[in-house]
Amino acid sequence: LRVYDKLAGKHYFKYFKKDAFLSLNPHIRQDKFLGASQFSDAVTDDSRLVMRVLDEAIHDGAHAINYLKAESLITTEQGLVVGATLKDTSPQHSTHTYDVQAKVVVSATGAWADTLRMQASQQTEQTFHKQIRPSRGSHLVVSQERLPLNQAYTFLHPVDKRAIFVFPWENRTVLGTTDLDHPPLDDTEVGITNAEVDYLLTATNDLFDDVDISRKDVISSWAGVR
C-alpha cells in the first residue's frame, strides 16, 4: 500500500493501533485484530459505466443491440475470421440467426472468450489450450439499519483467509465478494448459491460485534462471472 501511495504521489496510507481504531469503529469485535490500516481505493457504478460507454459508442457511430449473441465465427478456408453468426436470444425471436460480414472482428467477450478462440483456431475441446478460468463473484445487500457503516472495510475470511469487503452503497450495505470456479459457461443466468450466502454472512458476523446478520436481512444479491 505504501508503494501505491509512492506511485500515486499522494499519501493515503495510515496505520491505527488497536485502541485508536476501536475509538473510531466501536462496532468491530475487539478480539479479532491488533491494529488496522487505512488506504484509498476507487469505486464506480458498473451499470452506469456500461451505459455511458454504450452512449459514447453510439454517438461515435456504433450500433448497440441487446439480446444478440455471437453464436459462432465465420472463417475462410484459410482460417481467416471474416464475420460472425449472431443469434437473437430475446424471448420473441429466440431462433433467429444472422450472418454478419466484417473486415475486422474484435472479441470483447470476457469470460466467454475461449469459446470463440477455440472456433477461430479450428481446434477441438480436447486439443484446445484454454487461457480463461471463469470465476464467479457474488454479493449480498442489507439495510444500513442492520449494518450501519460510514466507510468500507476489507478483512480476511475466518475460514479460508480470503479478502472480503463490506462497504456502504446507495443507503445500503454491500457484503462481498466470493471467488469460486464457475462451471462451464452456458446461457444460464448467473446467481448466488446458498453456500455463498452462508459464506458471506459468516465473515460479516465474525467481524462485527452483536450484529447477527441472517438470511432474513438480505434485501438482494447479485453475481457475475469474470
Model-found features: residue ranges?
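Flavin (primarily FAD) cofactor-binding/catalytic cores of flavoenzymes
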Residues: L68, D88, T202-D206
